[in-house]
Regions:
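Short, low-complexity N-terminal intrinsically disordered segments enriched in polar/charged residues
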Residues: 4, 16-50, 148-150
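Surface-exposed, charged secondary-structure patches
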Residues: 72-113
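Sec-dependent signal peptide recognition
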Residues: 1-7
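A short gly/proline-enriched turn/hairpin at secondary-structure junctions
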Residues: 47, 51-62, 74-77
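Hydrophobic pocket/interface hotspot
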Residues: 32, 44, 52, 63, ...
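Hydrophobic/aromatic beta-strand elements that line small-molecule binding cavities or substrate pockets
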Residues: 32, 67-71, 84-89, 102-103, ...
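Short beta-strand edge/turn micro-motifs at domain boundaries
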Residues: 119-147
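Hydrophobic h-region of N-terminal signal peptides that target proteins for export
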Residues: 9-16
Length: 150
């Protein structure tokens, strides 16, 4: 009887310790970029972790509420055609990242103003939650001054 109990306990322990598969970080970032370019604010916010961090220059936003309001909601309507060029990426069972360069069209605030183009470097880091969903945990953008689009 003791052997059967130990065998069952061992089986349950092994079943609960399944090894996680690495994320498809390209698919995660494409989902984020597609939602951003389609102005799907709620979808973008839904991809953020509760403890997400956003850094850009000397700006730092902490947590889903602040990042949602001060980065996503305040900038999503002023940008379009976000594109990335990945230079480095990596994944394991709980963390995935991509880093590289980006370009984005900057829409004018007034109709008579010219369109701009923004370029810079990015890092997006995703973490797997306890519910097995991947969420954007860290975003860092370092951009050059916006140039008039030719």
């Amino acid at each position: 009887m003791k052997t059967i109990v130990l065998a069952l306990a061992g089986g349950l322990l092994l079943a609960g310790c399944k090894s996680g598969e690495p994320a498809n970080v390209q698919a995660l970032n494409q989902e984020f970029i597609r939602a951003w370019n389609n102005k799907e604010t709620d979808k973008v916010i839904g991809l953020l972790a509760e403890d997400v961090q956003f850094l850009q220059g000397n700006v730092r936003f902490n947590g889903k509420s602040e990042v949602s309001q001060k980065w996503v909601r305040e900038t999503i309507t002023s940008l379009s055609d976000l594109k990335t060029n990945v230079v480095s990426s990596g994944t394991d069972a709980t963390i995935a990242y991509e880093a590289g360069t980006f370009s984005v069209d900057v829409l004018p605030e007034q109709p008579q103003q010219p369109h701009g183009i923004g370029e810079g470097n990015f890092t997006l880091l995703w973490k797997k939650g306890t519910d097995d969903t991947w969420k954007l945990s860290y975003a860092q953008l370092e951009d050059l001054p916006v140039q008039v689009k030719q």
